[in-house]
């Protein structure tokens, strides 16, 4: 079951669920909340090494942190690792049912050729950080992305009550910065 706007608004207004953004400033849709683009993003460096080996590479050798002043023009086929401004804590079960967050790109941007992907698609139970967003321009044209523009939407869906709930142990406190991939032999 996916929660609707009225239920979400009630949960956040009552502080049963929490957000780092004032509830009056959240962008509620019929069954989701729009999230906005943080000014911080990573791009790939020009480097002599052309292969990233997930078992051996140090990702900091390949990526550089940037900041959007007002906007960036995403070139055709260009990829950036961005982040959302908003974070949500929905770890308190409602009526004995636990919920997780699910992220999708906005259809308007998709129709322009922008793919927004959260590497996991779902936030694990207890996830309460900002989503890291893989943003790719599939269009033959440059597309302008503005700081704080609505970039994706988050849905809240229930978990099967037969599972043992384990709290999220992921990437840590990103707080508006994209989480870089963790590489190394122990990860693959």
Where on the chain are the PLM-derived regions?
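DUTPase catalytic domain/fold
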Residues: 1-188
């Amino acid at each position: 079951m996916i929660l609707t706007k009225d239920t979400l608004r009630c949960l956040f207004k009552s502080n049963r669920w929490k957000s780092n953004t004032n509830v009056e400033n959240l962008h509620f849709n019929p069954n989701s909340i729009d999230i906005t683009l943080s000014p911080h993003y990573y791009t790939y460096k020009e480097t002599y090494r052309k292969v990233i080996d997930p078992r051996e590479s140090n990702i900091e050798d390949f990526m550089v942190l940037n900041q959007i002043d007002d906007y960036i023009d995403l070139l055709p086929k260009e990829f950036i690792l961005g982040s959302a401004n908003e974070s949500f804590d929905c770890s308190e079960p409602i009526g004995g049912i636990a919920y997780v967050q699910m992220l999708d790109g906005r259809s308007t941007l998709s129709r322009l050729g922008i793919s927004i992907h959260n590497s996991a698609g779902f936030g694990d139970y207890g996830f309460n950080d900002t989503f890291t967003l893989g943003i790719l321009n599939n269009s033959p044209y440059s597309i302008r992305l503005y700081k704080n523009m609505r970039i994706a939407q988050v849905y809240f869906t229930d978990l099967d009550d037969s599972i043992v709930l384990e709290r999220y142990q992921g990437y840590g406190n990103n707080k508006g910065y994209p989480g870089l991939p963790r590489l190394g032999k122990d990860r693959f």
